[in-house]
Structure formats: structure tokens, C-alpha cells
Amino acid sequence: MEVIASLAHYYDQPLRCFTFGDFLLVPIIKEFEEILGCPLGGRKPYLFSGFYPFLDRIAKIVKISAQELGNQIENGVVGVPRKCLEEKARALASQDEWAPFIDVLALLIFGVVLFPNVDGLVDLAAIDAFLAFYNSRESPIVTILADLYDTFDHRCEKSSARIACYTPTLYVWLVSHLFRQEGRHVCPLKGHRSCIEKREASWD
């Protein structure tokens, strides 16, 4: 988190990039496709329709009653508590119900890693993005990148603003540009892991 907070100081809002003297770094779609392992390809990009989904749609997937989900409100935000989903995932794993387990795990990734909003809660915005991917295979990459720029813009306007979203992705993206080695891996995450070995990695 400290690394990302430091990175924010180098963000140039008018240019929409990070500036290091005469050197510019710009997050692009292709890089985020590789990091997240989710190529856009011919997929339709996810765009919020303006209407949040009914909870009964997600209830069928995570195997939790819609009534129970409807009672989950935190700080005025409707969603599914992370703790509730984690408990459900453990229960499904203990029963060897791997298909719904994977669905619950994917929802947790969308709510906790990709689209975090309220701590400890997977809100309706994250659920909507998950359902678009689950039902129509819509790619969240474009939305993630747009939210990333919006977050740093907000940080420029209000220095106390917290950077909560995409910090793992941003960290891998940054490290993939700081380190280089021969035969660079297609996935920057793999390159990041191998850069621990000093003899194989070098600074640009």
C-alpha cells in the first residue's frame, strides 16, 4: 500500500500518466489483460447499465436465500458481507461442491480485489460486474482501467482520498516496469516472482 501511495505522487492528472522526470508510464488495457489473465479479445466490455441487479439473481449462484441477502445492509450500502461469502465457500468446499465454490470465490475476487468499496462488504456494483462476466462473459478490464484513472484523479483533487482498488494489480504493473530479464514472461506476475533472484533480474 505504501508503494502505491508513493506512486500517486507521480500521477499527472492532465496527461493521465505517471511522470518520472522525462520518463512517462501509462497503464494500458493490454498490460491489465495480461496481469489479470482476462483478455478482452472479442468480448463485450462491461459497462454499468444504470440499474443494480436484484439480489435473487446472485442468491441462486451463491446458494444463499434472497431474503437473507436482503437483510445485509452496512453503512446504508446493500451487499453481501465478505465473512458470509467466506463461510459459504468453506461450507461448499467441505461438501465437495466445487462448481458453486468456484462461483462464490469468483464473486469474492470481484468484490474484494477488483471492485472494493465498503470494507468487508461485496456491494451491488461488484455483484453487477460479476453477473455480467458470469452470464455474458463481459470483460471488466476497461471498467477497471477507467476506475483506476478516476481514483487517481480523485486523489489529485483530494490528497487524503484513499486508494483502495486494484492495489495488487497496480503493484504488479509497477514492478513489471521496474525489473527486466531476458525472455520476459507473457504474464508480468511470473516475471515479478522471478525478479526475486538478483542474478536474473536487473534494473532498467
PLM regions and their residue ranges:
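Structural stabilizers in ordered domains
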Residues: 1-204
